[in-house]
């Protein structure tokens, strides 16, 4: 069997989905969705092109590089490198996503070499990545924190073979709506009310109301480093009104239905906690 040499080249990001140069971007999104379906066996991670496109438009806060991966005439995956402009800007975030039938052909290793070279060219000395690992039996890999583990699956073996180390496990949880689960949520809600006497709840849909922008920006900055990150190098993100505006614009332009809920401390009047709930067009 003859294996085609992979063709890995930068993708042109169109200004709109109707632009003549949008074909490769649309194919990238289609294949991206297939890749996540192959990983998890469901469509939970599926996103529409309109949702993804705003996040690849030029931004003063982050540069996003993306390559398409072809095997012959077939688009089989993508490779991406995110370059935040926060702090000392020493970290790059990498991703390699390939169709399952393109595994074990050296394509991923070739793509990784391109990403590492690009990271060095942009002055980055650390590459970090988040990889989805469905739960599976067999040999496991445990991070230094001792919390959680992942199966030694294809993606884990690839990362370890190339000198990367598992630093932290983040758990993905799913809540299926049912009478039982909603009763459980209602009970948690009552418990929370009993412990949250000094707070009010406020909520909004983008764009963020002017009176909440400063506190929302402060919370976004703090959560970038306050959230557990084990030994990973995380620079604090700098959020201000301009970045909140871009953040909101991405949600709005992508057509996502977003609800932001925040806790406001009654004594100070400041927002002190928040959560974001987003759903995509056509996703139940």
Language-model-detected regions and their locations in the chain:
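Short helix-capping and hinge/turn segments at secondary-structure transitions, especially at repeat
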Residues: 221-229, 253-256, 268-272
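Acyl-donor-binding surface of acyltransferase catalytic domains
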Residues: 1-7, 112-210
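Amphipathic alpha-helical hairpins
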Residues: 227, 241-260
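Short hydrophobic/aromatic beta-strand or adjacent loop that forms the aromatic wall/cage
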Residues: 64, 168-172, 258
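Residue-level preference for long, well-ordered alpha-helices that form the structural scaffold
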Residues: 21-24, 104, 148-151
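Short amphipathic alpha-helix that is part of the acyltransferase structural core
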Residues: 1-55, 61, 195-242
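Conserved donor-binding loop and adjoining core beta-sheet/short helix segment
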Residues: 32-144, 148, 264-284
